[in-house]
Amino acid sequence: MIFSEAWLKEWVDPQMSSDHLMERLTMAGLEVDGFSSVASNFKGIVVGKVITVEPHPNADKLKLCLVNDGVEDYKVVCGAPNVIPGMKVPFAKVGAEIQVRNEEVPLKIKKAKIRGEESSGMLCSAEELGLEDKSDGLLAFPDEFSLGSDVRHALELEDLSIELDLTPNRGDCLGMRGLAREVGVLTRSECKEPDFYPAQIKHKTELQIDILAQDQCPRYLGRVVKNIDLNQTSPLWLREKLRRSGLRSIDPVVDVTNYVLMELGQPMHAFDYEKLHGGIRVRMAEKNEKLILLDGKEVTLEPDILVISDHEKAVAMAGIMGGLSTSVSEKTKNVFLECAFFSPLAIAGKARTYGLHTDASHRYERGVDYELQHLAMERATEILISIVGGEAGPITETLGNLPKESSVDLLFANVKSLLGIEIPPDEIKDILTRLGFVIEKEDEDGLTVGVPTYRFDISLEADLVEELVRVYGYDNVPKTSGFFSQTLATKEPEKMVPHDRIRNSLVDLGYQEVVTYSFIDPKQSDLILVLPDAQKISLQNPISTEMSVMRSSLLPGLVDAYTHNVNRHQERVRVFESGLVFLKEEKEIKQEHRVAGLISGDRLPRNWVNEKGLSDFYDIKGDVETLIALGNSVEEFSFDNSEHPSMHPGQCAKVTTPTGVEVGFVGALHPRIGQSLGLDGSIFVFELSLDVLQNGELPRAQALSKFPEVSRDLAIVVSSEVPAAKILANVRQNAGDYLSNSRIFDVYQGDGVEKGKKSIALGLTWQHPSRTLSDDEINKIISSCVNGLHEQFNANLRD
């Protein structure tokens, strides 16, 4: 939300500097995201009055103006199309300074000759004062502005536009009234509401209002205002307040509804009364019902969308955007004003379904005070009639199922228990009362308070405690108090591999850590499957349609990060992420901690030493083995050929523990994924269970032997279908207790080896702890290994 500090001070004056105010708001949970001056840094511009306007003798588009500043007259050449005698305008006299956009040094106004005529100053547009991005003519001032007065003072431009980043639970602060109430509480300042006057009823015309969706629309108010004149323009004070709140002026009707939105936090909408047929019905959309919105976009409405309709068709998406067919135009003479309370659940996420986000939907999603509608209707009517004239009819109100007022119990002992400090009961009552809570019951142990209708976020005792400490001041809570001083660290088991150690190991291997959203595009979820029958977990209130499904794998985020980098000409990418994935099993949603990595491009960074070599399956498999080795014996884990819906056939391995628990998978991403994303080259990935990786084994200490090692090489021929890991496992099983190292150092297929078979060369090393092993002992062990390989795999020694 963006608000004007000067407008806020019309409601409440905290008697503090802007910096102090912004700090106080931030510390109370209303985070200030930024601020800016409401105008450019101009000097010496005063209110002037155009006395006469004559054609320029040497230029058709220029005019000669006589301008008075309250003291004397000045000749000024002006090219604005809207300049007329009698209007009051910003007058930059000789010596004034104007800040030109994108220029560091201001423009100093000098006396000049323009097409042969002397000009002693400049008449300014709103654009030249930094009040608008684009202006078509001079800025016209109201008649009450005093001639010669400084424009900065006349327009109260010593003001800031402050932007708040409000959390979703603080919808009550999305209007000046709620924000002023909050500032008043935080600073112990009096909040003064402007005077609101009910409109005089001048006619009896009403529209019948029927609420067919009573849970979704608990309250709907309407009023017909007749004989308005939309050739009028919104007054400068109204346009300025909207501008400083981040809204542009459109026409008097829209400006008034936007003003009430910003002042009270209540969205409103205006229909052209003559374009409505029969009456108003608030209902759910019919299947495949269509509506052309105000922006000209046609949408097909889903049955869960709440709509406003007349007796013929839908005319608005309730709480989101109006329809084009009943929109107000310059020809409109009679308007129907709508002011309603829509349930937050009825509006939440619906705008994003259609790629929309409006000020109205933003507020309705968070909750609007359901007692505010009468006040907002009267306020809008009062301002509208003061601008465009007209005659107000009676307010027509229809009720659905209004929310029930709620109460919350608060025990004083629990305040101390949760905060670690003791706030006196009288101060607790004072804070809650100033926040708008009503003390319904009290005794020596605690209170029962009634929750204000504008606070949808208060339902628990802990919510009240949060309100107390927020107003009491987080900075007033001693650092050594209660919970905040406790160290709740628990000692992890010695065999547990710390999460940070796994992350740091990947960084040491050249990976860069990324953090991606847990919400992904459904198309991504379909493209990169974890399991063929995995059920998608859709969000009821997604940020956008591209972020509407919970991730069941970390790979979509990594592929996104890879695509982002490749599109920016990064040829070598190594990224990893650790985080939660979400799996649906029957009716339950299960969370799993995982770590995943992706590599592509060169094996090593290019330089004069490293020759170009592309990453392959064995590079990423080696990285996975490094992670396993942090807490376990790599030799005991198995990498077996596997099929995976997202992986390349023949280049995917399932990783399992010695007890058969599946850790995850490693391999090449399926080529169809790269092709669908427009990516060239091979992409290698892994995804592993973080819980299994962290569950290591205690290291077994062993004394170093002082006796010599004995090494032998063994080359066998075996079927090419036999995994190398199984051969190593068989050898280790038959190689005796003193085998200290075993590895495969060569695999060969080709001349001299029968088709369908492969030659595998193993390097074996033995070492006895207390003596030297003899050749006879080693030869017997070799024979045992060869026999074991022959029996299990029909392997033979290579000639």
Regions found by a protein language model. Give the residues of each.
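Glycine/proline-enriched, intrinsically flexible loops and inter-domain linkers
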Residues: 5, 23, 63, 192-289
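Extended, well-folded interaction surfaces typified by the phenylalanyl-tRNA synthetase beta subunit core
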Residues: 178, 408-572, 712, 765-767, ...
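Phosphate-backbone binding interfaces of nucleic-acid-interacting proteins
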Residues: 1-203, 336, 355, 359, ...
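Beta-rich nucleic-acid/ligand-interaction surfaces
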Residues: 39-43, 199-201, 486-487, 491, ...
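Conserved mixed alpha/beta core segments that line enzyme active sites in large multi-domain catalysts
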Residues: 47-77, 239-240, 257-325
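A carboxyl-terminal module marker
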Residues: 2, 27, 434-437, 588-590, ...
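Mobile "lid/hinge" segments at catalytic clefts and subdomain interfaces of large enzymes
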Residues: 115-124, 128, 137-140, 152-153, ...
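Terminal amphipathic helices with adjacent charged low-complexity linkers/tails
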Residues: 187-212, 388-415
